[in-house]
Amino acid sequence: MPELPEVETSRRGIEPHLVGATILHAHIRNGRLRWPVSDEIYRLSDTPVLSVQRRAKYLLLELPDGWIIIHLGMSGSLRILPEALPAEKHDHVDLVMSNGKILRYTDPRRFGAWLWTKELEGHNVLAHLGPEPLSDEFNGEYLQQKCAKKKTAIKPWLMDNKLVVGVGNIYASESLFAAGIHPDRLASSLSTEECDLLARVIKAVLLRSIEQGGTTLKDFLQSDGKPGYFAQELQVYGRKGEPCRVCGTPIVATKHAQRATFYCRHCQK
């Protein structure tokens, strides 16, 4: 599933081609996504794009009368293409732009979403979200406060959007490795120093992935059709049985809440 770096990479890639241009119309080939494509999107016509923003793993296209909320789901990607390029099997939504480009949404599993809202505030998919991990609000003090009485393993807690948004399976595993923290540790067992370090490395890992265009394991592509290159820098995720890049100990794979977790027994305590 695309996580924060992949969604932010998509935002940065599509923004220059959308802001200041006008949506001439939308072409919906298959509106049966995780939720049906909103009727308002079908009716788009001569609509300028004012901004392209992101909240958690949602892309937000600001229009004069409302917002398009896009979620990439498990396998979605957005590309900027010439208008004349024929669609393929899993290309479900096109926004045809006034500058001769299209924003094309591709999603083999069809678990993404294209929704419409007049107001972002209070929308059900955006309500009750925690802070952005790259914001000043997310720091060691905040993390310690939220972990202090939490009797659950730190790995799934990092993936809870009520704590912090956008830190999915890949980046939770990578951040815990960078901080030297075992994924099975109770959140409440983390010291002040460990919370401070973990908050800092989460930011560093996410920023590095954004610099590399995100992580492509299977389906994700940047807006120019290129893969994300952070996969080449993964320390533990997806490396079961391979030697730790630091100490040589084989990487272990377990499961938390049905999600794969990767770690080094020697480096993470």
From Swiss-Prot:
Start-end of FPG-type zinc fingers: 235-269
Biological process per Gene Ontology, one example term: base-excision repair
Gene3D superfamilies referenced in this protein's UniProt entry, alphabetically: 1.10.8.50, MutM-like, N-terminal
Binding residues for DNA: 90, 109, 150
Family annotation (SMART domains): Fapy_DNA_glyco (SM00898), H2TH (SM01232)
InterPro entries reported for this sequence: DNA_glyclase/AP_lyase_DNA-bd, DNA_glyclase_Znf_dom_DNA_BS, Formamido-pyr_DNA_Glyclase, FPG_cat, MutM-like_N-ter, Ribosomal_uS13-like_H2TH, Znf_DNA_glyclase/AP_lyase, Znf_FPG/IleRS
Molecular function, one GO term: zinc ion binding
UniProt keyword annotation of Hydrolase present: yes
Presence of the UniProt keyword DNA damage in the record: yes
UniProt EC number: 3.2.2.23, 4.2.99.18
Cofactor: Zn(2+)
Cofactor info, note text: Binds 1 zinc ion per subunit.
Active site: 2 (schiff-base intermediate with dna), 3 (proton donor), 57 (proton donor), 259 (proton donor)
Subunit structure: Monomer.
Function: Involved in base excision repair of DNA damaged by oxidation or by mutagenic agents. Acts as a DNA glycosylase that recognizes and removes damaged bases. Has a preference for oxidized purines, such as 7,8-dihydro-8-oxoguanine (8-oxoG). Has AP (apurinic/apyrimidinic) lyase activity and introduces nicks in the DNA strand. Cleaves the DNA backbone by beta-delta elimination to generate a single-strand break at the site of the removed base with both 3'- and 5'-phosphates.
Family membership noted in the UniProt record: Belongs to the FPG family.
Protein known as: Formamidopyrimidine-DNA glycosylase
Organism: Salmonella typhimurium (strain LT2 / SGSC1412 / ATCC 700720)
